[in-house]
Amino acid sequence: RAYMTENKKDSVIREIDEPDVFLWAIWAIQQYAKEAGVERAKELYAEFVNEILEFISGQKHPDMKVMENGLVFANGRDKAITWMNSTINGKPVVPRSGYIVEFNALWYNALCFYTELTGGIPVEKYDKLIKAMDTSFQDTFVNGYNYLFDSVNGSIVDWSVRPNMIFAVSLPYSPLTRVQKRSVVDIVTKELLTPKGLRSLSPKSEGYRPYYVGPQYERDLAYHQGTAWPWLLGAYLEAYLRVFGKSGVSFAERMLISMEDEMSLHCIGTIPELFDGNPPFTGRGAISFAMNVAAILRVVDLLKKYNAE
């Protein structure tokens, strides 16, 4: 709230000014609603969610604007504004600017979730954005090869096969059709899935660097250009279960075996930051990474719920 009202940076929440921080905050409240109930979430957080939506739709964020087609347009040409935030000499290794796929998947999900908090009663200005995005998201991101562009900025289109598209399937609300969701899961499975997480870039793409080794410069180049990230496995398995339902449970359980094995290596009982994108998928970076641990625990909890049905 301090950032939205006074533009105050937060010493606790790093990079609070990055555009997707606000969208992930709404997602976190959505997870709370699943556990505590929508009514309790409404009582505690509906006003806060609306404040965030007002902040974004009111064009108050310095690096993200809502366009006439309902999509959010983010300025990341000269600075890193997404989770792919490695830089060299102050410039992003993976510049992502314009219509960024996971930003817009999160934005659509946030708008729909707020309608859930209002008891299904549409808020006219948000409902208008949702309906616009039902068309514009597909027109902007879906390509002829049955996957999603990573980002689109006018004539500059990023065709790279990256994991960010998986959020358009894993999130509770999505503008994609069931067939499109299946296509996204299929290509992510074929090109990005490893036993340790999703690759940050397909091996078929130019610039693929699977090994996080060498001096800082070399590691910065590889950080989001082919290394595999366990936290993305959480989103992938959630997306997989959304597409395949209970029939996908055994596959998801098998995928977690490699993570169970990993907990007896490196730092015992936890999961490192990232892995090489090629075999033998060696663990790299920080020996324990909270995002990865949380994502795997979420999948374990999700599987318990599927098995209880």
What positions do the PLM features span?
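Catalytic cores of carbohydrate-active enzymes
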Residues: R1, S57-N69, F73, Y99, ...
